[in-house]
């Protein structure tokens, strides 16, 4: 075999090796084993909800043992619901950490797109003048696992479990229109306001609450004189501090409520619905508070 043929054969061998194995070395002792990663979602009652469609998209940041970002992965709703594994192979690190966040809004994705270190990863609510936009149905989770070396055979499959990071709130205020009218003439557009707060506005990538205090404006509708809010989502409070629901009229805070009539505080529970019912009719203020499963609004008797 002449030199030209030997060269061609050598090149072909290298190409074939590259096709069937990601590691081209004299032996496999330093080769990382490929593996697959899946995402699994849980609700607050530890029920597997991966296939329900609750997760619309997931961004997964991959960090090495020093906290340096080495990869960024995206999954859509169909991939998550089908439990589709992502094939991966990382040569170099001894361990990797997968930091997964589900359902971030476009603003959050843009803010985190160029993060290069885990300590710089934050999921911050959009806000104006201390009033935050309600977050999406956020989930997150972290998985740290070793990188297996010494073979090109398939390594151990891995699963990153993600959990809800927000609470839901639903508000009903009976007699709201009459209460407003009793507190002065109606002067649009800013004659009244309802604010709920306060919570931190930021999660770290590792799901620790930090940042500035913000409130939320539960823009609802007045139906038959009653205020009924949509279901809003909020970040949890620090140290189970209760939320305060503040009712304003004509620029003045007229009511500030943080507990039910029985003393139960307005504490948002991650992965649950906080129901606040306020009756402004009659001589005495009546406030009911309850916690129900996610997406389940408490039904109150009409009287």
Curated annotation (Swiss-Prot):
GO terms for cellular component: cell outer membrane. Residues 1-22 form the signal peptide. It holds the Pfam family Mfa2. InterPro entries: FimB/Mfa2/Mfa3. Gene3D superfamilies: 2.60.40.2100. It is a lipid-anchor. The keyword Lipoprotein applies. A lipid is attached at residue 23 (N-palmitoyl cysteine). A lipid is attached at residue 23 (S-diacylglycerol cysteine). It is found in: Cell outer membrane. PROSITE patterns: PROKAR_LIPOPROTEIN (PS51257). The keyword Signal applies. It comes from the Bacteria. Keywords: Cell outer membrane, Lipoprotein, Membrane, Palmitate, Signal. FimB is not part of the fimbrium itself, but anchors the fimbrium in the outer membrane. Linear, head-to-tail oligomerization of fimbrial subunits mediates assembly of the fimbrium stalk, while the minor components FimC, FimD and FimE probably form the fimbrium tip. The anchoring subunit FimB limits fimbrium length and is important for solid fimbrium attachment to the outer membrane. In its absence, the major fimbriae become very long and are easily detached from the membrane. Anchoring subunit of the major fimbriae. Regulates fimbrial length. These filamentous pili are attached to the cell surface; they mediate biofilm formation, adhesion onto host cells and onto other bacteria that are part of the oral microbiome. Fimbriae of P.gingivalis are major virulence factors. Belongs to the bacteroidetes fimbrillin superfamily. FimB/Mfa2 family. The name (major fimbrium subunit) does not indicate the abundance of the protein, but is derived from the greater length of the major fimbriae. In strain ATCC 33277 and strain ATCC BAA-1703 / FDC 381, major fimbriae are 300 - 1600 nM in length and about 5 nm in diameter. In contrast, minor fimbriae are only about 80 - 120 nm long. This length difference is observed only in a small number of strains, including strain ATCC 33277 and strain ATCC BAA-1703 / FDC 381, and is due to a loss of function mutation in FimB, a protein that restricts fimbrial length in other strains. This is Major fimbrium anchoring subunit FimB. It comes from Porphyromonas gingivalis (strain ATCC 33277 / DSM 20709 / CIP 103683 / JCM 12257 / NCTC 11834 / 2561). The lineage of its organism: Bacteria, Pseudomonadati, Bacteroidota, Bacteroidia, Bacteroidales. The gene is fimB.
């Amino acid at each position: 075999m002449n030199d030209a043929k030997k060269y061609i054969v050598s090149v072909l061998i290298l190409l074939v090796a590259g096709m069937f194995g990601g590691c081209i070395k004299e032996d496999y002792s330093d080769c990382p084993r490929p593996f697959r990663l899946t995402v699994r979602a849980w609700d607050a009652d530890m029920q597997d909800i991966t296939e329900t469609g609750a997760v619309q998209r997931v961004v997964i940041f991959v960090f090495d043992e020093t906290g340096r970002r080495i990869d960024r992965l995206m999954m859509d709703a169909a991939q998550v619901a089908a439990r589709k594994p992502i094939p991966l192979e990382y040569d170099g690190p001894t361990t990797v950490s997968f930091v997964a966040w589900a359902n971030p809004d476009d603003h959050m994705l843009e803010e985190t797109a160029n993060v290069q270190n885990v300590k710089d990863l934050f999921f911050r609510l959009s806000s104006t003048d201390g009033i935050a936009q309600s977050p999406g149905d956020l989930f997150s989770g972290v998985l740290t696992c070793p990188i297996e070396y010494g073979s090109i055979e398939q390594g151990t499959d891995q699963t990153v479990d993600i959990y809800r990071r927000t609470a839901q709130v639903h508000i009903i205020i009976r007699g709201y229109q009459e209460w407003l009218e009793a507190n002065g003439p109606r002067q649009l557009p800013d004659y009244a306001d309802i604010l709920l707060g306060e919570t931190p506005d930021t999660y770290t990538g590792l799901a620790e609450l930090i940042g500035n205090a913000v409130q939320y404006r539960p823009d609802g509708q007045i139906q038959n004189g009653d205020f009924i809010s949509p279901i809003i989502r909020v970040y949890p409070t620090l140290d189970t501090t209760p939320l305060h629901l503040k009712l304003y009229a004509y620029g003045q805070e007229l009511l500030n409520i943080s507990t039910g009539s029985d003393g139960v505080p307005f504490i948002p529970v991650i992965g649950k619905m906080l129901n606040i019912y306020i009756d402004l009719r009659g001589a005495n203020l009546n406030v009911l508070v309850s916690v129900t499963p996610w997406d389940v609004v408490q039904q109150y008797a009409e009287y």
